[in-house]
C-alpha cells in the first residue's frame, strides 16, 4: 500500500502543470469567470471640484451595479486645498501646480493597475466662470497639460472644463437622490435641491412630463429650463436653473453695489472696510447706529430684482421661471452655505452631517445677529471671525431668508433638510455635485451599461 501511495505521488508531481479550471472543469471555470467579471466592471473615478474658494478632490469606487464600494472605512476619499484656481488668474501654470498634491493623494488611493482605466475629471464652477477675458481658459489648458503629462489616469479630451450652473445643479440632484436611494423611483418620490455656493445658487427638482412639455422656451445661447436625464432606466425631467452672481460671496457684492456712496443697512455698527470679490472692490461701511433688519431686507430684495417683469405665470426673481413647483419640490435638500452659515452661527452642532431647517429659523437668528455691533459679533461667532466674515453675518442671514422665501417662494415654516453630508449605507458621502459627475463618468465606460446619461 505504501508503495502504491508513493507511485501516485510521483505521477502527480511528474504530470504537466494544469490550471485549476482545467482540472476541476466547468464548476471552477464558471466561478472564476464570475470573479473576473466583478473585477473588470468594478471601477474608480476621480473628480476635482474647482470651486470659487478652493479646490477639492473626490475619489469613488463603484461596483457593476453602480453602487459605491468602500475606500478604507468610508465610501469616498475627500480632501481640499485653498485658495481656488481663480486666485491664480495671472499665473495659470501655478494654478495647475496647486492641484498636484490632490492628484498625488488620488494616485495613492487608486491601485496602480487600475489607474489607466480610471476616468479623471475637473469641473470648474462659478469662480472661473466670473474671470475676465481668456484667463479661465488659460488656467484650464494648464490643468489639461498637467494632467496629461503628470497623471496616469484616463484623461479624456473633455475631462477639464467649466461646468455651467445647470450641470452643477443636475449633478447635485443626482448625488442627493443617489445617496438617498431614490433613483429608479417615480419623480414624485425624489428630492429637490438648492445649492448656495460662493458665486452662484442652483435649484433643481424633478417635474412631470406635462410641466416639462410646457416649459418656456429660452433665448438662443441660454440654458434650457428642463434637462432630461436617464437614471437606472428611468427618464427624469429636471427643472434646473443657476443664478450667477447670487452665491454667498457674490451676493455681498450685489448688495453693496446698491450703496456705493452711503452706509449699508446690512452691516454691523463699528465696521468700515472694503469688500473685494472677483477682482472688484466695494465700499462696506455701516451706519453708526448699526444694522437695520427691515431696511437690510428691503435692500436685499432690490438686489434680487424681485420686481423684475415676469413673462411667465410664476417666477422666482430676475424674471426667471420657477419650474411650476409640484411634488418634486415638496421635499428639499439645501447644501453648501445653507449648512455652513447655520453651523457657524451656532444653529446646529458642528458634528451633525445634516439637520432640519426652516426659513423662519434663519430669520430669528438674523434678528439676533443684526442687533450686535462688529466687536460683539466677532466674539459671538468665532468661526465667522476666524474666516474674517463676522462683519457680514447680518447680511448673509437675511440674504438666505429672503432668497428662500421671497426668491424661491417657500413658506417660512417649510421644513428643509440642510446638510453637508448624507448617510449612505454604513458610511456618508459629501452632499455636492462631484458624485453625480462621477456616476456619469463611470456610466460612459464601455464595460458599464449606460446607467446614467443626459438626453
Swiss-Prot record:
Chain ranges passing through the membrane: none
Molecular-function GO terms, alphabetical: nucleoside diphosphate phosphatase activity; ribonucleoside triphosphate phosphatase activity
GO cellular component, one term: nucleus
PROSITE patterns given in the database record: GDA1_CD39_NTPASE
Record: active site: 168 (proton acceptor)
Protein keywords: Hydrolase, mRNA transport, Nucleus, Transport
Compartments, record wording: Nucleus
Organism domain of life: Eukaryota
Role of this protein: Might be involved in RNA transport out of nuclei.
Record-given protein name: Nucleoside-triphosphatase
Organism the protein comes from: Pisum sativum
